[in-house]
């Protein structure tokens, strides 16, 4: 385990913005995780657990220790009704999904090509095309940072919500996800109700056909972070009450939304697109011309460029629809997590 000093974070997050960390260490075992968090030299320093860095924006140089989760490995078991997959927290999520499909195991195909690591999936309760992580989760293994004990949380204990979980609330900064357990039924049912997936002919429906379709759509609509720096969907799809929805529907008949329990989930990309932000650029930051929900590092942008562009979008959407957008991307300051509203006050 090598502890690096004053290291560039550009290769460690998909926005690929030049920023540095005072310390950085890549850990390949739980013992190494414990060593870092128990190290008296680092005790008072802020720490940030990072997977593939696909959902973060570093707004300042990080003054503490960035801990990169490299825990790897996966195992497969089964009984008469289910497949069970145990994946270490540093396992690449897109590779895990593809591996399952290649094994003939269905259930994860709708979650194909979502960047990130297995350990990040429960924190964010990742989701796409009608499936969320909570739908396939059996358990999440965590390392508690106060006494370094290991716990196994059931899916219910994870308190999953829309892009939300207990790891953002009661367990925030209290633990590290070291592994996840997935439970996938052998009696596979296609989840093809969303948009382009309906184009697949019924006789061709399979985990593999849905996997390929999801990959095709994502590659067509979303920029490859290896080519253009980005963190995927920058904003969450806002959830509003039905009274507000009905007012907007009367004024904007083409508004795109879906039921979310007793409320409505509005397509943030549609809202941003209707405010004419596709292709808009601030400094080196740009709203992707094909997908308004994605902000990109188009030309060696700074974090401030992204912040200013995101602020303009939030203001425009509020002025037109009275909907407050919430960013899905995590903003990381010099000492830890912050948010757009705090940064706007500071600037």
Swiss-Prot record:
Catalytic residues of the enzyme: 163, 233 (proton donor), 328
Domain FAD-binding PCMH-type, residue spans: 16-187
Keyword Cytoplasm (UniProt): yes
Cofactor(s) demanded: FAD
Listed GO MF terms: FAD binding; UDP-N-acetylmuramate dehydrogenase activity
Gene Ontology cellular-component terms listed: cytosol
EC annotation from Swiss-Prot or TrEMBL: 1.3.1.98
SUPFAM superfamilies: FAD-binding/transporter-associated domain-like, Uridine diphospho-N-Acetylenolpyruvylglucosamine reductase, MurB, C-terminal domain
Keywords carried by this UniProt record: Cell cycle, Cell division, Cell shape, Cell wall biogenesis/degradation, Cytoplasm, FAD, Flavoprotein, NADP, Oxidoreductase, Peptidoglycan synthesis
Record pathway: Cell wall biogenesis; peptidoglycan biosynthesis
EC class: oxidoreductase
Places the protein is found: Cytoplasm
PANTHER family named in the record: UDP-N-ACETYLENOLPYRUVOYLGLUCOSAMINE REDUCTASE
Function, in words: Cell wall formation.
Family membership: Belongs to the MurB family.
HAMAP family from the UniProt entry: MurB (MF_00037)
Protein name per Swiss-Prot or TrEMBL: UDP-N-acetylenolpyruvoylglucosamine reductase
Source organism of this protein record: Vibrio vulnificus (strain YJ016)
Phylogenetic classification of the source organism: Bacteria, Pseudomonadati, Pseudomonadota, Gammaproteobacteria, Vibrionales
């Amino acid at each position: 385990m090598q502890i690096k000093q004053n290291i560039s974070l550009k290769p460690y997050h998909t926005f690929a913005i030049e920023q540095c960390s005072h310390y950085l260490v890549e850990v390949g075992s739980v013992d190494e995780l414990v060593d870092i968090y128990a190290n008296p030299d680092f005790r008072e320093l802020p720490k940030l657990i990072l997977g593939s860095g696909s959902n973060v924006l570093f707004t300042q140089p990080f003054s503490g220790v960035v801990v990169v989760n490299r825990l790897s490995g996966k195992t497969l078991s089964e009984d008469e009704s289910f497949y069970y997959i145990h994946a270490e927290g540093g396992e690449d999520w897109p590779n895990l999904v593809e591996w399952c499909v290649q094994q003939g195991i269905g259930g994860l195909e709708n979650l194909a090509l979502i960047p990130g690591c297995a350990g990040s999936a429960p924190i964010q309760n990742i989701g796409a095309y009608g499936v969320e992580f909570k739908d396939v989760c059996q358990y999440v293994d965590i390392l508690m940072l106060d006494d370094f004990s290991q716990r196994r949380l059931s899916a219910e204990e994870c308190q999953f919500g829309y892009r939300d979980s207990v790891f953002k609330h009661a367990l925030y900064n209290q633990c590290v996800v070291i592994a996840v357990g997935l439970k996938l039924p052998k009696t596979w049912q296609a989840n093809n109700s969303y948009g382009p997936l309906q184009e697949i002919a019924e006789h061709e429906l399979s985990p593999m056909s849905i996997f390929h379709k999801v990959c095709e759509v994502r590659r067509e609509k979303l920029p490859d972070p290896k080519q253009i720096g980005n963190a995927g969907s920058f904003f969450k799809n806002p959830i509003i009450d039905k009274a507000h929805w009905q007012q907007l529907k009367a004024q904007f008949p083409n508004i795109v939304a879906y039921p979310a329990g007793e409320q409505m989930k509005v397509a943030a990309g549609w809202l941003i697109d209707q405010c004419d932000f596709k292709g808009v650029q601030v400094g080196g930051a740009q709203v992707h011309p094909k997908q308004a929900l994605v902000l990109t590092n188009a030309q060696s942008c700074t974090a401030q460029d992204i912040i200013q562009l995101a602020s303009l979008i939030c203001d425009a959407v509020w002025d037109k629809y009275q909907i407050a957008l919430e960013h899905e991307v995590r903003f990381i300051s010099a000492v830890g997590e912050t948010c757009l509203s705090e940064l706007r006050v500071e600037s």
